[in-house]
Amino acid sequence: MSPLAHRRFLKMNGLGNEIVVLDLRGTPHIVQPQEARAIAADPRSRFDQLMVLHDPVTAGTDAALRIYNTDGSESGACGNGTRCVAWAMLEDPVMGRPAERLTLQSRAGLLAVTRVSATDFTVDMGPPRLRWDEIPLAEPFPDTRRIELQIGPIDDPILHSPGVVSMGNPHAVFFVDRDPASYDLARIGPLLEAHPIFPERANISVAQVRGPEHIVLRVWERGAGLTRACGSAACAALVAAARLRLTGRRAVVTLPGGDLVIDWGEDDHVRMTGPTELEWEGTLAPSLFAGAA
């Protein structure tokens, strides 16, 4: 029987971004890609990101965190999911303990989370990575504020010249004049995600700047597809816009699921503030893993 059978999980969302939180502290088991896909295939535990808690391995941290996409691949960052993990660790009667701050160790580095209210949290996502080899890109670009990349006819591209940023995972942000909802991101997104310029694939965003403190965003999420919200993409969009002087260093980013406040501080850290919501709790059925061995 899978070590995940009968494990309790929390189904949550951050602005409609579907999150499952699974606590594996106290057990050595590492979720395998086929197990993540099996959990995602069940309507009760369907997720955009699976957030798995492990015992801390770094002094001064509260937990280690592994993040899975629906296709079983791992991600270095998920801002909306990190807020949900913070709620689980601070508010859930089974997992939780009273505190105002948490520090989590993810594949991308340390994530510091601060409580704003019972449901809202601020996540310090750390500094953005802006060099071409940090994002990473497949070839050198000395200026990543805009790179040579387009989709559509060469003389009339649908999207072109994105800014590229890593927030622990690679992002390409295309700035447009029209409402981002008018672009067929379900068709364009997977083509750009897998473009050879992105050796680790990329999250693809279409962004419209509506003022110096307001960005409207739609996101095709690497390994997950269209999503109602993506916290790391919102952070990347603010950084990309500020580098082009389209906005200041603080803005409200409006996604289909709602608003996030993104602040790129003078200390170079990007902080994201937004809500969480618990939808239900459940246990993983053993039958989910019958074909996942």
From Swiss-Prot:
Active-site annotation: 78, 230
GO molecular function: diaminopimelate epimerase activity
Gene3D superfamilies xref list: Diaminopimelate Epimerase, Chain A, domain 1 (3.10.310.10)
Site-annotated residues for Could be important to modulate the pK values of the two catalytic cysteine residues: 171, 221
Highest rank taxon of the organism: Bacteria
Enzymatic reactions: (2S,6S)-2,6-diaminopimelate = meso-2,6-diaminopimelate
Single GO BP term: lysine biosynthetic process via diaminopimelate
Cellular component aspect of the GO annotation: cytosol
Entry binding sites for substrate: 17, 49, 69, 79-80, 169, 203, 221-222, 231-232
InterPro entries: DAP_epimerase_AS (IPR018510), DAP_epimerase_DapF (IPR001653)
EC number: 5.1.1.7
Family to which the UniProt record says this protein belongs: Belongs to the diaminopimelate epimerase family.
Cross-referenced PANTHER family: DIAMINOPIMELATE EPIMERASE (PTHR31689:SF0), DIAMINOPIMELATE EPIMERASE, CHLOROPLASTIC (PTHR31689)
Quaternary structure, from the entry: Homodimer.
Name of the protein: Diaminopimelate epimerase
Lineage, highest ranks first: Bacteria, Pseudomonadati, Pseudomonadota, Alphaproteobacteria, Hyphomicrobiales
